[in-house]
Amino acid sequence: MDPSTTILRVKRKRGTDPADALLLACKRIRPEATAAQPSDESEPEPQEPKIENSVFKLVATVVSQDAPVQPHVREALARPRLAHHALRPSQGSSQRIIGDLRSVKWSTRREERYRILSSHRAGLPSEPAPAGGGGEENHDSHAESRDGLPLGEVQVFDILHEEEDVKVPGKMVVSDPETILCNSVKMIREKLSVSGAGLGTEHREKEDDYVYDLYYQETATPGWIQDILSVRPYSQEGELVPDEVAWEEEVYEDEDDENAEANWRNDYPEESSEGDSEGEERYGGCWSEEHSYSRRSRECYRRDMIDELENDKDEDDEEREYNDSD
């Protein structure tokens, strides 16, 4: 095992399928330079840790959290593996991932299926133990030291595999005839149950219902992991490439002036042709017959009006001549 080894220990419910590999976006603490700097030179300011992408492969599954980690990892690494580099991302994919993850903040851990529980670094007594978790960390330290590996070279992250709520579609809700309603609002029934087994015994989950999957990174990166931004399952290299967002906005050239008269956007059809085309599209062949009939009706009406005006004019002339003769 390489120095500064990081192992992911995922708590998974028994009966669910484990992920073959996990894609981990994290920040690492770079090791300090061995060469001492002169006293007259000012120390450089510490740089912000860069976001890195690492692939951890499933190497073993244990039934207890107290089981030693390193023997199982060593045994899995000693076995011959056919696809040793099958899940390792290419350099181009890694660069695209790093560029995409630079914009990710700590709040992006919200909807992940894997939740970080704790972090342990075996065999570091100088670091203060967190409150409430000192016993577990000391136990891990003794377990790792018995394996013969130097202290302080293993970092273990405990991760919980959370199951998604599976809702059955179309499930009918049976109404309870004894339900008490007040203004169409269901009232809450309070029931008191006394049990000698303790509070909430029926809702507790047995520890035997869970197993622990161990994930190991083949190519160790120098430096301890400081912050984990996201953990997600990873099966093939194509998943590392982010999907391109297809924008529905129209792209115009810079020389395309919308206010120019010759612009294609300002070519509007005539009102009559537009009305005819809409009517033809809506009514089909009946529109042409109806349209021609209405045109003939207008022409007939126009001729009738002209004839009526001419008749009125003739009558006026005759009446004027009759008056002049008198």
Curated annotation (Swiss-Prot):
Q: Name one Pfam family in it.
A: Iwr1
What does the function comment of this entry state? Directs RNA polymerase II nuclear import.
- Where does the UniProt annotation locate this protein? Cytoplasm; Nucleus
- Quote the protein name from its UniProt record: Probable RNA polymerase II nuclear localization protein SLC7A6OS
State the GO CC annotations: cytoplasm; nucleus
Amino acid composition bias (Basic and acidic residues), ranges on this chain: 136-147, 280-297
Compositionally biased residues, Acidic residues: 269-279
Q: Which PANTHER family match?
A: RNA POLYMERASE II NUCLEAR LOCALIZATION PROTEIN SLC7A6OS-RELATED
Q: Which InterPro entries match?
A: SLC7A6OS (IPR040218), TF_Iwr1_dom (IPR013883)
Q: Which UniProt keywords apply?
A: Cytoplasm, Nucleus, Protein transport, Transport
The family assignment reads: Belongs to the IWR1/SLC7A6OS family.
> What GO biological process terms are annotated to this protein in UniProt?
central nervous system development; developmental process; midbrain-hindbrain boundary structural organization; protein transport; somite development
Annotated region (Disordered) at 30-52, 120-147, 252-297, 307-326
Q: Looking at the keywords, is Protein transport present?
A: yes
